[in-house]
UniProtKB/Swiss-Prot annotation:
Transmembrane segments: 8-28, 37-57, 61-81, 109-129, 138-158, 172-192
Protein name as catalogued: Putative manganese efflux pump MntP
Gene: mntP
InterPro entries registered for this protein in UniProt: Mntp/YtaF, Put_MntP
Subcellular location: Cell inner membrane
Flavoprotein is among the record's keywords: no
Organism field: Bacteroides thetaiotaomicron (strain ATCC 29148 / DSM 2079 / JCM 5827 / CCUG 10774 / NCTC 10582 / VPI-5482 / E50)
Length: 193
């Protein structure tokens, strides 16, 4: 792969992180740098780690991962999105607010948005990337791009969501976005391959 192809691949992989970050930013409502950095770091780390894991185990597990990666990503995103949608219809007084900055949610979203990156790692092995020095550059670029796009998405979501989040039912739209990403992953794998 050329350098340009790796950067374009990194941007493509980071789009799910970007969309989830926008949804999370809408819910956060105000700039909170610590949770924003933790979220962006988690997304970047998992986007870098998953291709490495996929690359390491490609020869042994590729047929298993390729057959279910889209279902795993869809299930996780649909669960999180469905939960957010349901919570958006509860009364304000009795509702537990969905917290996209909680460690459990960040971890789950980071895994869900990086499942495709696992498959990319498998394809790296199939493309002939054979040693650690060759895989290092692509995974660092993928992690960096995902980190930056996640921060931008969070900031954008916060700025768009400020003042109008209540009127727009931010949790409803955030949930719809997560379910849509899950459906996109599922449709791409079932019908476009």
């Amino acid at each position: 792969m050329t350098g340009l192809e790796i950067w374009l691949l990194a941007i493509g992989l980071a789009m799910d992180c970007f969309a989830v970050s926008i949804a999370s930013g809408i819910i956060l409502k105000r700039t909170q740098w610590r949770p924003m950095l933790v979220m962006a770091l988690a997304f970047g780390l998992f986007q870098a780690l998953m291709p490495f894991i996929g690359w390491m185990f490609a020869k042994t597990f590729s047929h298993l991962i390729e057959s279910v990666d889209h279902w795993i990503a869809f299930a996780i995103l649909a669960f999180l999105g469905g939960r957010m949608i349901l919570e958006s219809f509860k009364d304000e007084d009795c509702r537990q607010t969905f917290n996209p900055a909680s460690p459990k949610v960040v971890f789950t979203m980071a895994i869900a948005t990086s499942i495709d990156a696992l498959a990319i790692g498998i394809s790296f092995a199939l493309l002939g990337i054979n040693n650690y020095t060759e895989i290092l550059s692509p995974i660092l670029i993928i992690g960096f791009v995902s980190f930056v796009m996640s921060l931008i998405g969070l900031y954008f979501g916060i700025k768009c969501g400020c003042g109008c989040a209540r009127k727009l039912k931010a949790e409803l739209w955030g949930g719809i976005i997560l379910v849509a990403i899950g459906l996109k992953i599922l449709i791409e794998h079932l019908f476009l391959q």
